[in-house]
């Protein structure tokens, strides 16, 4: 029996299967299909509107000209059989599974090159062809509130408090058991420096498994909170108060060769960082203004940046929590880069893809890494989404690596589906109210 036939047999054990496609905003879109029919979609794909990747945060319609688009027709969303996993929290007594999908045009059956998962796999393939593997994980922050009052489940900045954690243990332990049963591996949880703010640290994974798992984690947290007495949000800045703590999603990653050796560690270097690590840092620093569009992809994200202890200036440093790129150099297995730019609303597939594209540019071109720390020549990150999108469009190397279709669609999605909604608003209070409507849930 082939692997595909084995998976089809496994699918038949479920009552229902969710077929989920990640759009440009990091939202799962798809359909729930009966388990007895689900296997056929592995061969034939699932019909969805051909522009669904472009949907805005609240499914605002964004349209783009493309030679393969025809009369607002359909494309095909194909499940990846390797992503089959149970989703135990959906309904008691009903067996539900999920598979993650990628989109293809009906004309010719070729990939939609703006599909975030496809773009991430394409960049991972570039690494594989060079003999490298990406090993990565996330620190996912989320804010938890009481559903009846919408007040945070705790106030203050009592980070790491076991007492605060204990008060929410019943909810968190229920959530984590379901996550574990769904093959979503969270290593640890703790309260963070902000009212109602928690962090979930995922177990690092190789390749596409990391962004797959992180999106499943975020989806699971929101879905389980929907049936509990709490509300969970990943909105970057859910309060108008500038002093309120923003919500991030730090991306930790390292490179390894096929023999299992760290490519970022060098025992003989004074700082234990290899030449490749320095070149990679140089690459992501060079492209950081453009990367900001993917790392902080909403209008609201820029309320989080340029605040104390949040990214503002473009520099790196060893164990430096004010740097955009915080470097850990604790031996071969503990040497990695912590990208502190990503917002809680960022799309993990696009973070992985753009990070690889920028880092490889540094390695291939052997870029020289500037010294760590901030100087008078240090440049700042963009202050608005509009500015970040302009930087992305200007970054020819990044556009070439990621593909013009992705960048064109992403920019169109953001300008027409989000930025345009704020042009008629006069006050910051009005703008924030619209941000909360768009990004809170």
Feature locations, PLM:
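Active-site-proximal beta-alpha loop/turn segments in soluble metabolic enzymes
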Residues: 144, 152-162, 195-210, 239-246, ...
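C-terminal accessory/tail domains of diverse enzymes
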Residues: 2-10, 22-27, 209, 220-234, ...
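Acidic/histidine-rich catalytic neighborhood
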Residues: 247-271
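Beta-strand elements of well-folded, non-transmembrane domains
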Residues: 105-107, 146, 206, 257-259, ...
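Core alpha/beta catalytic barrel or barrel-like domain that forms the active/cofactor pocket
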Residues: 134-146, 182-202, 232-252, 291-299
């Amino acid at each position: 029996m082939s692997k595909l036939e084995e998976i089809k047999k496994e699918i038949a054990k479920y009552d229902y299967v969710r077929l989920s496609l990640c759009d440009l905003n990091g939202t799962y879109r798809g359909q729930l299909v009966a388990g007895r029919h689900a296997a056929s979609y592995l061969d034939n794909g699932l019909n969805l509107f051909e522009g669904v990747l472009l949907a805005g945060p609240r499914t605002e319609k964004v349209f783009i000209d493309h030679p393969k688009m025809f009369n607002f027709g359909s494309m095909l969303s194909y499940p990846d059989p390797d992503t089959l996993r149970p989703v135990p929290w959906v309904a008691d007594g009903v067996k539900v599974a999920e598979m993650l999908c990628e989109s293809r045009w009906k004309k010719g059956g070729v990939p939609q090159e703006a599909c975030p998962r496809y773009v991430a796999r394409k960049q991972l393939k570039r690494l594989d062809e060079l003999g490298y593997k990406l090993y990565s994980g996330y620190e996912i922050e989320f804010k938890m509130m009481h559903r009846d009052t919408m007040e945070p489940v705790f106030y203050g900045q009592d980070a790491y408090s076991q007492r605060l954690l204990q008060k929410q243990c019943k909810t968190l332990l229920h959530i984590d058991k379901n996550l574990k049963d769904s093959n979503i591996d969270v290593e640890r949880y703790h309260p963070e420096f902000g009212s109602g703010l928690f962090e979930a640290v995922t177990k690092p994974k190789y390749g596409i498994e990391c962004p797959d798992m992180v999106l499943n984690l975020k989806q699971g947290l929101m879905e389980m909170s929907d049936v509990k007495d709490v509300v969970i949000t990943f909105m970057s800045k859910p309060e108008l108060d500038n002093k309120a703590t923003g919500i991030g999603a730090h991306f930790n990653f390292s490179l390894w060769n096929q023999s299992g050796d760290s490519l970022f560690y060098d025992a003989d270097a004074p700082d234990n960082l290899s030449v490749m690590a320095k070149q990679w840092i140089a690459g992501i620093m060079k492209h950081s203004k453009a990367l900001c569009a993917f790392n902080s992809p909403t209008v609201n994200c820029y309320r989080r940046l340029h605040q104390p202890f949040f990214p503002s200036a473009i520099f790196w440093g060893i164990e430096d929590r004010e740097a955009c790129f915080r470097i850990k150099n604790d031996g071969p297995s503990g040497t990695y880069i912590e990208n502190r730019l990503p917002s809680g609303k960022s799309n993990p597939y696009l973070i992985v893809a753009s990070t690889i594209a920028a880092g490889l540019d540094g390695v291939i071109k052997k870029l020289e890494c500037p010294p760590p720390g901030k100087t008078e020549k240090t440049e700042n990150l963009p202050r608005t989404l509009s500015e970040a999108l302009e930087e992305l469009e200007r970054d020819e190397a990044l556009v070439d690596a990621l593909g013009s279709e992705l960048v064109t669609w992403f920019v169109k999605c953001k300008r027409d589906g989000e930025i345009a909604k704020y042009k008629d608003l006069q006050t910051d209070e009005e703008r924030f109210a619209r941000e909360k409507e768009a990004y809170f849930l």
